[in-house]
């Protein structure tokens, strides 16, 4: 669920990764100055999405995207496409 592309996308682009995808990390390593947190709410530290020089949680990213196409913190365009770095904790896919 969410790990496979639809048949139309695979036929159009093949098996290569689509360009413009921003990685979503489920577990970030601890940084030099402590844990990485969402720059908007400062609570979320899992499922962060990289904006230009900071991280946003999915809730804050959705809220910011509903207001504008640009980040209210750094002023750069907000990410629109997400790529998962690690697969979510679910049973392995068996066809």
Curated annotation (Swiss-Prot):
InterPro entries: RING_finger_Z_arenaviridae, Z_RING-type_Znf_sf, Z_RING_Znf. One of its GO terms (biological process) is viral budding via host ESCRT complex. Belongs to the arenaviridae Z protein family. Myristoylation is required for the role of RING finger protein Z in assembly and budding. A lipid is attached at residue 2 (N-myristoyl glycine). A motif (PTAP/PSAP motif) lies at residues 88-91. GO terms for cellular component: host cell perinuclear region of cytoplasm; host cell plasma membrane; membrane; virion component. One of its GO terms (molecular function) is zinc ion binding. It comes from Pirital mammarenavirus (isolate Rat/Venezuela/VAV-488/1995). It is found in: Virion; Host cytoplasm, Host perinuclear region; Host cell membrane. Plays a crucial role in virion assembly and budding. Expressed late in the virus life cycle, it acts as an inhibitor of viral transcription and RNA synthesis by interacting with the viral polymerase L. Presumably recruits the NP encapsidated genome to cellular membranes at budding sites via direct interaction with NP. Plays critical roles in the final steps of viral release by interacting with host TSG101, a member of the vacuolar protein-sorting pathway and using other cellular host proteins involved in vesicle formation pathway. This is RING finger protein Z. Interacts with protein NP; this interaction probably directs the encapsidated genome to budding sites. Interacts (via RING domain) with polymerase L; this interaction inhibits viral transcription and replication, Z partially blocks the product exit tunnel for the releasing nascent RNA product. Interacts with the glycoprotein complex; this interaction plays a role in virion budding. Interacts with host eIF4E; this interaction results in eIF4E reduced affinity for its substrate, the 5'-m7 G cap structure. It is a lipid-anchor.
